[in-house]
Design a protein with these regions (language model features):
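C-terminal non-catalytic regions of proteins with extracellular/luminal or membrane-system context
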Residues: 29-47, 53, 210, 367-371, ...
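Short glycine/threonine-rich loop-to-helix capping motif typified by GTGT followed
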Residues: 233-235, 329-344, 375, 471, ...
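Bacterial N-terminal signal peptides that target proteins for export
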Residues: 2-15
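N-terminal beta-rich core of secreted/periplasmic extracellular enzymes
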Residues: 32-274, 302-319, 336-416, 428, ...
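Binuclear metal-dependent hydrolase catalytic cores centered on His/Asp/Glu-rich metal-binding motifs
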Residues: 273, 280-300
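Short beta-alpha connecting loops at secondary-structure transitions
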Residues: 289-295, 330-336, 378-394, 399-411, ...
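N-terminal signal peptide c-region/cleavage motif recognized by signal peptidases
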Residues: 24-25
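Short acidic, glycine/serine/threonine-rich loops at helix termini
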Residues: 167-173, 227-232, 278-285, 328-333, ...
């Protein structure tokens, strides 16, 4: 017997039904699922409650939470129009007013409604600020309400770039806001403990779910084999075995276990398959001038091995790299010179065929867009660059042809675009089969069912502030920041004494005073100088959108570097401690001889740093990459090989205990 209930916003509390399952061969009692709805009516079937997502007054298999996700997904695909299927294969950027990137505090709901209701898109990256978790949660609820109001009520998958560390860079990561603040993934690699990585990712998972995020565009399984590459601080370093272990722990924590997705999971999209870190000349392939990863040797396997950690943890998503694998070969055969999102060998033959990946392949952002004119050459002086496309290797194809080539290569979903009509026309013109779209749509919808979105798309915004950035979680994050410090040199300076007079550069005076130090104004008055700096960089591509934001070029301290000048000044007068934020492997040859103590950090607050300097505990972290002795040595390195620098100043795995 079926009865119909009016739509409401309340949660249906769990209760135990005593009637047999309608579709199950087992005549056992079943616990009522918890349901959230703002738009869909509820129906009762034999004493159980379900959401009538398509509003036909019947319980359809895809609405039946008792059935397995694969069966529900197959039923839903069978009910969808071609337009709706094409929309599922888009992964848009949730729009905000006045921002091309989607930054801000509130969504542009009119623009979002167009994407959801007219283009049938139901996956979005959010770049909303995390400064107000409750507001962020309610904004994501508003997207879900728009999605629930559509013909089939397919919920939105909301994704994010990493937002729990010190780095913030558009297209890479988001400012931390109120979320727990940890060291960069390099710091987790420096600690080297897979269980700590799992705990970190598990905490991030809970924070994400609290604000309505169910997909993480992370981690990076890329090897940082080219030390000038701007994306190194999002990796786990240059060692394949260490990276594999870290990736496995990350995916396990993010997905709430090693056995695939469940109702508490956040989908982990591991990136960037494969070889991204072998960046030619250190340039990044977000930019036309950096489209190549250079393989001078047949070393692709080094870069594949870290991804096997993701496969062992049953990662649900993979994102291909923008890069063209220049000169790369596989068992002696050359690899097609197109970006990985267009490369059938890399996606279908290697990823799915040889390594058995059966999840969703989500393209990196804007691979089907054009890159012409100033996208190739940079804008003229005085003009502001804007993001374009990254269609590397297929620049001469039309956008429609790029979509077709990517789908045939193995892509399931397209990042950063919502032009679903292109896929519709390709099917109508006989250039793609609808059955091929069904395969991708089925994969994507199955994950929505697995993560519980059809039953509970909304979150309790009132609880978000209590969950995000919880005090005990931040205490663990602070402990992790401290443990990630790598002691490179210590000539009888550590531990520092409370009450010491300190001259500071790059460190907050209030934090030093709270840690028990006496702050002085000139080095001559100090017992010790404490200096914070970061890996040097250049910005030779300020006329490119991403190039203007990337830290590129030389890793060495020049004489005119203000931080280096502070080191020279202080070390001539007083024992000097220097800590370097290692976003890339710095050349420290002209720094190490001027310091009594030298510490590598991968993201640490002033207060955590200062209290660690007082502590007498041993330092246990190790470098996740080698530190070259000179830029000449860097230029001689093979971009695709790990730890091949000539006579590195500090080798991979180096770290003093005290």
């Amino acid at each position: 017997m079926t009865s119909r209930c009016a739509p409401h916003t309340a949660v249906v509390l769990p209760w135990v039904a005593t009637l047999p399952l309608l579709f199950s061969p087992l005549a056992e009692a079943v616990q009522q699922a918890t349901l959230d709805t703002r738009e869909a009516p509820l129906i009762n079937v034999d004493g159980l409650t379900f959401k009538d997502l398509n509003r036909d007054g019947k319980l359809n298999p895809y609405e039946d939470w008792r059935l397995p996700p694969a069966q529900r997904a197959a039923d839903l695909v069978s009910r969808m129009t071609l337009d709706e299927k094409a929309g599922v294969m888009m992964h848009g950027s949730a729009p905000t007013a006045g921002s091309v990137t989607g930054a801000g505090n509130q969504y542009d709901l009119n623009a979002a409604k167009t994407m959801i209701a007219e283009r049938h898109v139901n996956s979005f990256i959010t770049r909303l600020s995390g400064d107000n978790p409750a507001q962020m949660a309610e904004e994501n609820n508003k997207l879900q309400q728009l999605a629930e109001a559509t013909r089939l009520g397919i919920p939105a998958t909301i994704s994010t770039d990493p937002r729990n560390s010190f780095q913030s860079l558009v297209g890479v990561s988001v400012s931390v806001g109120k979320f727990s603040k940890w060291p960069e993934t390099l710091g987790l690699a420096a600690i080297g403990d897979e269980e700590r990585v799992r705990i970190f990712a598990d905490i991030v998972r809970q924070e994400y779910r609290a604000v309505g995020i169910t997909e993480a565009l992370s981690p990076q399984a890329d090897l940082s084999t080219e030390p000038r590459w701007p994306r190194i601080d999002g990796t786990f370093g240059e060692d394949p075995d260490l990276t594999k272990k870290m990736v496995r722990g990350y995916v396990t924590g993010m997905q709430n276990g090693k056995n695939g997705l469940n109702s508490q999971s956040v989908i982990s999209v591991v990136k960037h398959w494969v070889g991204y870190g072998a960046a030619q000349d250190g340039w990044d392939s977000h930019n036309a001038y950096g489209k190549y990863a250079l393989f001078r040797q047949n070393n692709l396997q080094w870069h594949i091995d870290p991804f096997t950690g993701a496969f062992e943890a049953h990662a649900a998503g993979i994102m291909p790299t923008y890069s063209i694998l220049r000169n790369a070969r596989w068992h002696g055969k050359p690899i097609e010179q197109v970006g990985a999102g267009f490369n059938r060998f890399l996606l279908t033959d290697l990823l799915r065929g040889q390594y058995g990946f059966d999840g969703v392949i989500l393209s990196d952002w804007l691979i089907t867009n054009d890159c012409k004119g100033d996208c190739l050459t940079g804008v003229k002086p005085g003009e502001k660059p804007v993001p374009r496309g990254m269609p590397w290797g297929v620049e001469n194809l039309t956008p429609a042809e790029r979509f077709i080539k990517a789908v045939n290569a193995g892509v399931d979903q397209f990042g950063g675009v919502t032009d679903s009509a292109v896929l519709v026309k390709a099917v109508q013109d006989g250039l793609l089969s609808e059955a091929r779209l069904d395969t991708s749509v089925n994969r994507i919808l199955k994950q929505k069912f697995q993560t519980g979105l059809f039953e509970r798309p909304y979150v309790n915004a009132g609880q978000a502030d209590d969950i995000v950035g919880r005090t005990d979680w931040q205490q663990l994050a602070d402990d992790t920041q401290a443990r990630a410090l790598v002691l490179l040199q210590n000539n009888n300076l550590l531990p520092l004494r409370k009450g010491s007079r300190v001259w500071l550069h790059g460190i907050d005076a209030k934090a030093a005073q709270e840690a028990g130090f006496v702050v002085v104004n000139v080095p001559e008055q100090a017992d010790v100088a404490l200096i914070r700096t970061h890996t040097p960089y250049e910005q030779p591509h300020k006329n490119f959108f991403f190039g203007s934001r990337h830290h590129e070029g030389s890793l060495a301290f020049r004489a005119d570097n203000p931080d280096y000048q502070a080191i020279v000044r202080a070390s001539a007068r007083v024992p000097t401690l220097v800590t370097v934020y290692m976003e890339r492997p710095a050349v420290l040859t002209n720094v190490v001889d001027k310091t009594r103590t030298l510490i590598a950090n991968f993201g640490v607050s002033d207060s955590v740093l200062l209290n660690r300097l007082i502590s007498g505990a041993a330092y246990t972290a190790k470098l996740p990459f080698e530190l070259p002795s000179s830029m000449q040595a860097v230029l001689k390195q093979q971009p695709d090989l790990p730890y091949d620098s000539d006579k590195p100043l500090f080798p991979f795995g180096y770290g003093l205990p005290h």
